[in-house]
């Protein structure tokens, strides 16, 4: 006959197990009722109220983004260029100038296929180098540009040519301070000739080369040339490739004609000082040399 203690032990274990089952079942039932009342069962479709809240949050976010964009489309210095394009930190200005001069200089060694052949002239070199300097320089960018390019600086942080309110129409084409209507009435364009660059997109700096910095533009005015009276060069200063260590390099496109596509030249100012035609000498006594100008986005 079994010991009485052995018979009571199983009875206690079954009672304890039954108690656990009852408690668990009650808790599960209570949770199910509560979740049905709140409608917040994980994985279930959102209720109409939840959808409405989500739409409201998205609308508020969109409205906030619009306010930021509108706030950026102001011209606090009344120079005609919206603040969103202007590079306000030293780091961004330095990065832009390094990319700008490097891209312009590289065209002397090998023209990039990304530079439209129909826009290869002196102002076209400035436009091309400006746009490409303002892009993000990732692996795809290097592949598109071709050989001979390397990282010369970080990217411009405050402005991205591919994601901004103006798109690639970053060159102003008329006098006046900026207004939002300028974006719709043609006062900004992807194109800018030498005259447009001088009058609306740059500021005069100096006629003294000692005060010029890399990235400045040399501008000449040749009134006897009917179609394009203004000629532009890019001041490199100490070029990336400088066999003699000179620090007064410039690069420019000679311009095209019906019989000549023109070419990109890289030369020292000290050499241009002795140009056979004195009207092309970058000296203060030459009235055709207007001086050094700086892009407004760097001001």
Can you say where each PLM-predicted feature lies in the sequence?
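N-terminal Sec-pathway targeting helices
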Residues: 6-21
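Low-complexity, Gly/Ser/Thr/Pro-rich intrinsically disordered linker/tail segments
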Residues: 245-299
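N-terminal intrinsically disordered, acidic low-complexity segments at the extreme N-terminus
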Residues: 1-2
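N-terminal capping segments
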Residues: 43, 61, 66-188
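Low-complexity, Ser/Thr/Pro/Gly-rich disordered linker/stalk regions
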Residues: 31, 39-41, 67, 72, ...
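...with weaker cross-activation on analogous glycine-rich loops/strands in unrelated enzymes
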Residues: 151-259
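Short, basic, low-complexity termini and linkers enriched in Ser/Thr/Gly/Pro
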Residues: 36-68
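Hydrophobic alpha-helical membrane-insertion segments, chiefly the h-region
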Residues: 22-32
């Amino acid at each position: 006959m079994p010991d009485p203690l052995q018979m009571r032990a199983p009875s206690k274990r079954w009672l304890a197990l039954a108690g656990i089952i009852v408690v668990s079942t009650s808790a599960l039932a209570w949770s199910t009722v509560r979740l049905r009342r709140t409608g917040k069962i994980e994985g279930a479709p959102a209720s109409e109220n939840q959808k409405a809240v989500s739409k409201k949050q998205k609308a508020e976010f969109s409205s906030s983004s619009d306010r930021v964009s509108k706030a950026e489309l102001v011209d606090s210095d009344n120079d005609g260029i919206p603040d969103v394009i202007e590079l306000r930190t030293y780091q961004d200005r330095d990065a832009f100038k390094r990319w700008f001069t490097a891209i312009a200089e590289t065209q002397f060694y090998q023209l990039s296929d990304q530079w439209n052949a129909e826009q290869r002239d002196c102002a076209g070199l400035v436009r091309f180098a400006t746009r490409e300097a303002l892009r993000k320089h990732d692996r795809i960018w290097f592949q598109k540009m071709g050989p001979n390019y390397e990282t010369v600086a970080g990217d411009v942080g405050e402005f991205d040519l591919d994601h901004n309110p103006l798109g690639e129409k970053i060159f102003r084409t008329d006098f006046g301070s900026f207004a939002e209507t300028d974006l719709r009435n043609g006062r900004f364009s992807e194109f800018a000739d030498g005259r447009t660059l001088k009058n609306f997109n740059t500021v005069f700096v100096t006629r003294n080369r000692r005060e010029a910095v890399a990235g400045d533009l040399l501008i000449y005015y040749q009134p006897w040339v009917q179609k394009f009276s203004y000629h532009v060069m890019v001041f490199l200063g100490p070029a990336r490739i400088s066999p003699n260590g000179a620090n007064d390099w410039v690069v420019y496109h000679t311009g095209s004609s019906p019989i000549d596509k023109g070419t990109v030249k890289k030369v020292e100012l000290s050499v241009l000082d002795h140009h056979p035609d004195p009207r092309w000498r970058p000296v203060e006594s030459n009235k055709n040399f207007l001086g050094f100008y700086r892009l407004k986005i760097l001001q």
